[in-house]
Amino acid sequence: MFTPEREKELQEKTRELLRKIKDVKVLSFEEAKKLAEDLREVIRYHDYKYYVEANPVIPDYDYDRLFRALKEIEKKYPELITPDSPTQRVASEISGEFPTVKHYTPMLSLDNAYSEDELREFDRRVRQITGLEVVEYAVEPKLDGAGIALVYENDLFVRGATRGDGEYGEDITNNLKTIKTIPLKAEFSRFGIKLAEIRGEVVIRKDEFQKLNKERMEEGLPPFANPRNAAAGSIRQKDPKEVAKRNLEAIVYHLSYVEPPETEPPTHYESLKMLHTLGFKTLFKDTKVCKGIDEVIEYCKEWEKKRDSYPYEIDGMVVKVNDRRLWKVLGYTSHHPRWAIAYKFKPRRAVTKLVDVVFQVGRTGTITPVGKLEPVELGGVTVSSVSLFNEDFIREKDIRIGDWVVVERAGDVIPYVVEVLKEKRTGEEKPVEFPKYCPSCGSELVKLPEEVAIRCINISCPAQSVLRIKHWASRDAMDIRGLGDATIKLLFNRGLAKDVGDLYYLKLTDILKLPGFGEKSAMNLLKAIEESKNRPLDRVLYGLGIRYVGQTTAKKIAEIINSVWDLKDIPLEKLMRLEGIGYKVARSIKEFFNIPQNLEVLKKLEKAGVNLAKKVKEKVADVLKGKTFVFTGTLDCCSREKAGEIVEMLGGKFSNSVTSKTDYLVVGKDPGATKLSKAKKYGVKTITEEEFVNMIKDYVDLEKIKKEDKKEKPKIGRLF
């Protein structure tokens, strides 16, 4: 739609406008008219980049500044409002790649508030229209994902669509069916509902996002800028199998339409409760009903402080009038409902200087440029370096050493450069020169035709070797406790562990020579290494670090082979018959086994007694024998009842109350104060759900249990 030259013009115009729009209220009519035309032009461009391409080129905060400036101009001079103004309609995200469907009710945007004063002004308008002295609001986190509309008819999921232009969305039903948190059946009929349309967001957890970007960079693919882009780009994949690989989740937040109409719940909070009870993932437990605007503001401030600890990226809070009957009284504009507003958190951005660019070598040889910054505080964290991803990213943004840059940090996501302040250039800035040789081993670097990254292909590259050992020892692979980064580097630099096979030939005297190790810690490390010999086959496959082979792929491969050695001779076609394994992955596996050094490492592992074959499981009933478990709070892996069944299946005891005989209290989300207090009183060890899962994951199929647990009918109490 936009040529590269036109994009460059519009991006430059955006920068100019952001400098101009400090106070639009003092503009004359002619000045306002010209500025409004320019604002509409750049806003349409940024709508296209955000909604259609899922590749925004400016931060949300800057977009909102442009949009608010246009609204202020049109408020001062209503005669400047045009029918096609972005303020009069929802931005379109229709790409033309999927069939379109009409929403049952318009899927509008939300108006934004950036301060307490603006929230109070919203409350004043609501009270004025409704005639109420105090309004009850439902306040919930604002997820930063990709909007979807789900339709259920006669209890069955029949359609899923993107937001589109608000009236029509793109039909992505098959893609959404791969997302496990979307029930294919939900018993709305229990509430007399024959047809329901639900609104939600497709999101990706922050830890999954980090993992996804790491894999993409190792594969030579461009990383996603943020979790929202990852979610939006993923649901538009043409192959549902590709969507299924992304570990997406759908969280629903709104019941938008029901038939027959009289089955509609009276409040927003009650509708969330119903959806939660029917098996949808919702924001029900994070939603608070507030009496009046003061409580709303207090709750928003509370969440702004703890936003980083939330597993999903959130950029604010949504404030809705709780009584759904008042929604009709308050009505809508063509852009947003008048009964809701989004309170946006302050952006975590800062301006600093890029003082240098260094190059790091990844586990699979990918060369990543890292920008060194003059230290700057972002959201309570001091940032001194930033990933520059790859050569294309640097060229696209025209990043130079010595530039002043705008850096943004979103949650746990690695800080990144959102803009170069070219107007601050002095002429002394230097272009970034990419190396021709590996900074670790000196080998000539290569760039494969299908990749954006440059890569070192030397199997003996020191930097890659250290990272391969680190990956092997990681929690999801061989889980060697006590073998941290610093220890791995020391072992490698002293020639004690040049590859993962060498770990299993270490002696006590070797480890005692390392700084920081006494006899006890050295013995503990040797014990952890010894214990890792018995990990299941899929974790061994994942730990080998074969390019493109993640945890899911490793599990699928482990199901069709008896030993790692089977992969040496397995036909390419047989591998490609596995779901989710195409030619690229299969070829990478075959290439791994064609490298003599890799075969030598496998022989070392086998000789040391590392399990390279399907594990004959020990009698699982003995694993938790003699241990009593109590659970508190909500678990992600399964219900507390199901967790208790697992404990008993593995030989342990399950109890509902904490006593002096309890061994472990497993703490989930929103734990009960009584159980925590008793655990402290009796000296009972408290562990997280993650620690509990690590105890049992080698002996039970948690994915299967989770699915079976969801199929069980929930107990439905009185909701309305």
UniProtKB/Swiss-Prot annotation:
Organism from which the protein derives: Aquifex aeolicus (strain VF5)
Free-text function comment from the UniProt entry: DNA ligase that catalyzes the formation of phosphodiester linkages between 5'-phosphoryl and 3'-hydroxyl groups in double-stranded DNA using NAD as a coenzyme and as the energy source for the reaction. It is essential for DNA replication and repair of damaged DNA.
Residue ranges of domain BRCT in the record: 619-709
MF terms in GO: DNA binding; DNA ligase (NAD+) activity; metal ion binding
Cofactor binding comment, as recorded: Manganese or magnesium. Has higher activity with manganese.
Swiss-Prot/TrEMBL cofactor(s): Mn(2+); Mg(2+)
Gene3D superfamilies recorded: 5' to 3' exonuclease, C-terminal subdomain (1.10.150.20), 6.20.10.30, BRCT domain (3.40.50.10190), DNA ligase/mRNA capping enzyme (3.30.470.30), Helix hairpin bin (1.10.287.610), Nucleic acid-binding proteins (2.40.50.140)
Protein name from the UniProt record: DNA ligase
Cysteine disulfide links: none
Cellular compartments per GO CC: cytosol
Pfam families: BRCT, DNA_ligase_aden, DNA_ligase_OB, DNA_ligase_ZBD, HHH_2, HHH_5, Nlig-Ia
Signal peptide positions on this chain: none
Catalytic reaction list: NAD(+) + (deoxyribonucleotide)n-3'-hydroxyl + 5'-phospho-(deoxyribonucleotide)m = (deoxyribonucleotide)n+m + AMP + beta-nicotinamide D-nucleotide
Residues at which NAD(+) binds: D60, Y61, D62, Y63, D64, S109, L110, E140, R163, E201, K320, K344
Domain of life per record: Bacteria
Binding-site residues, Zn(2+): C438, C441, C456, C461
InterPro entries according to UniProt: BRCT_dom, BRCT_dom_sf, DisA/LigA_HHH, DNA_ligase, DNA_ligase_AS, DNA_ligase_CS, DNAligase_adenylation, DNAligase_N
Region Disordered: start-end pairs: 220-239
Alphabetical UniProt keywords: DNA damage, DNA repair, DNA replication, Ligase, Magnesium, Manganese, Metal-binding, NAD, Zinc
Cross-referenced HAMAP family: DNA_ligase_A
